C-alpha cells in the first residue's frame, strides 16, 4: 500500500449532503456519479511526504485542522501499515467521528509475514492494532479478507464490498453509501442533539401527565427525526412518544421502520424490560388488598435498583414517573419499607433525576 491510498468521507447529518475528502483524484466518472446520484461532493487533500517523525507531528496538526474545517461525521481511511493513515483514524476517533477502515488486503497472513520481526511487529503494536480494533467498522474487499480480519480477533464489524475491486462505479457508489448509512445509523448517539433528547422526553412526559399539565415540546425544525426515532426505539419508548405527540396535537413525520434497518449490534445496549411487568411477577396474594399498591411501588423501585440507572431505558424512567405522578399509594408505608431495604438514598437520587428530566413536583415525591 502506498501513502497516497487514503480517503476520508466527510458526511453531514443529512442523507444527501455528503463530502468526500480524498488524497488522490477519483477515477473518471466516479466523482461525478457520486455527486449526481448520491449528493456526495469530493474534495482533495495532500499527504505529506517522507518518514521524518517530526513530519508526523506536523501532519497530526494538519489533520485535526482539516477535520475542524470540514465538520465531518464519517472518516474513511484506506490502507494498512501507514502511520499517516493511522493518524487520520486516531484524530477522527478522538473527535468522536465514525471511522471506516479499508485494509485493502494488507492484513492477510502473507502480507503480515513479510519482514514480520523487523518491521511488521512494532508497526502492529504501535498503531495497526488500534487502527482496526477501535474503528467503527472494517470494509473488506472479499470474503477472504473478511476471514483474515476475523482471524486476527480485532474486529467483528466487517462489511464485504466486492464492488471496491470492480470498474462499475454505480455498484461502488451504492455499496459505499449503504455502508456509510449503516455506520451512521449505528453511531447516531455521537451526533444526538440536546434538543432531540428533550423532544423525546417532553413527549413522554406529555403522554403520562394529566391534561392540566402543560409541557412545552421543542419544535422539530432543525432536528433529525431519524435520530429521534433511533433513540426512541433503543429506549423502548416509541409508542409513548407517538402517544404524547398525538396528545399534544403535534404532527410527526412518516414513521421510520427502525427495527428492519441495518445496524451494528450495540454491545452496550440497554435491557429492554418493563419495571411494571417485573414487579407483577411478585406474588402478592398473601398481602392484604389495601397494601398491594404499596408493595408494587416498592418492587418497582427495587427492580430499578437491581437494573441500575445506567441500564434503565427511557421507558423505565417513564414508568417511574407514572408511579410517582399518578399512582395512589401511601408514601409513609412505601418510605418505611424502602428505609428497611436501605434504598432511601437511591430513591432520593431517582427523585432528583425525575425532577430534572420530567419536572416532577415536590408534592409527588416519597422522601422530601
What are these regions (language model features)?
Residues 7-8, 107, 121-137:
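Membrane-proximal helix-turn-helix segments that form the acceptor-binding/catalytic region
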Residues 26, 133-157:
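A short, active-site helix/loop in glycosyltransferases that binds the activated sugar's phosphate group
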Residues 45-90, 94, 122-126, 130:
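An amphipathic, basic-hydrophobic alpha-helix
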Residues 180-368:
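Conserved NTP-donor binding/palm subdomain of two-metal-ion nucleotidyltransferases/polymerases, i.e.
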Amino acid at each position: 500500500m502506498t501513502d497516497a491510498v487514503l480517503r476520508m468521507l466527510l458526511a453531514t447529518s443529512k442523507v444527501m449532503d455528503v463530502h468526500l475528502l480524498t488524497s488522490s483524484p477519483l477515477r473518471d466518472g466516479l466523482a461525478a456519479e457520486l455527486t449526481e446520484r448520491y449528493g456526495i461532493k469530493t474534495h482533495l487533500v495532500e499527504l505529506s511526504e517522507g518518514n521524518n517523525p517530526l513530519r508526523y507531528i506536523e501532519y497530526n496538526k494538519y489533520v485535526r485542522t482539516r477535520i475542524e474545517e470540514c465538520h465531518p461525521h464519517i472518516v474513511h481511511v484506506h490502507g494498512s501499515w501507514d502511520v499517516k493513515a493511522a493518524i487520520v483514524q486516531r484524530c477522527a476517533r478522538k473527535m468522536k467521528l465514525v471511522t471506516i477502515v479499508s485494509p485493502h488486503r494488507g492484513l492477510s497472513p502473507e502480507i503480515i509475514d513479510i519482514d514480520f520481526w523487523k518491521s511488521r511487529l512494532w508497526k502492529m503494536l504501535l498503531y495497526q492494532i488500534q487502527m482496526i480494533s477501535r474503528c467503527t467498522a472494517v470494509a473488506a474487499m472479499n470474503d477472504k479478507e473478511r476471514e483474515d480480519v476475523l482471524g486476527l480477533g480485532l474486529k467483528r464489524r466487517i462489511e464485504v464490498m466486492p464492488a471496491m475491486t470492480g470498474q462499475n462505479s454505480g455498484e461502488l457508489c451504492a455499496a459505499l453509501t449503504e455502508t456509510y448509512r449503516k455506520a451512521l445509523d449505528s453511531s447516531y448517539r455521537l451526533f444526538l442533539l440536546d434538543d432531540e433528547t428533550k423532544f423525546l422526553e417532553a413527549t413522554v412526559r406529555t403522554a403520562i401527565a394529566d391534561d392540566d399539565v402543560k409541557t412545552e415540546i421543542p419544535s422539530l425544525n432543525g432536528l433529525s427525526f431519524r435520530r429521534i426515532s433511533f433513540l426512541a426505539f433503543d429506549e423502548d419508548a416509541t409508542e409513548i412518544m407517538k402517544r404524547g405527540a398525538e396528545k399534544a396535537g403535534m404532527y410527526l413525520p412518516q414513521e421510520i421502520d427502525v427495527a428492519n434497518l441495518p445496524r451494528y449490534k450495540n454491545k452496550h445496549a440497554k435491557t429492554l424490560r418493563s419495571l411494571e411487568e417485573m414487579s407483577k411477577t411478585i406474588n402478592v396474594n398473601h398481602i392484604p388488598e389495601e397494601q398491594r399498591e404499596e408493595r408494587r411501588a416498592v418492587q418497582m423501585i427495587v427492580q430499578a435498583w437491581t437494573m441500575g440507572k445506567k441500564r434503565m431505558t427511557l421507558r423505565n424512567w417513564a414508568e417511574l414517573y407514572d408511579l410517582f405522578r399518578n399512582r395512589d399509594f401511601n408514601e409513609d408505608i412505601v418510605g418505611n419499607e424502602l428505609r428497611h431495604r436501605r434504598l432511601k438514598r437511591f430513591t432520593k437520587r431517582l427523585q432528583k433525576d425525575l425532577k430534572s428530566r420530567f419536572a416532577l413536583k415536590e408534592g409527588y415525591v416519597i422522601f422530601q
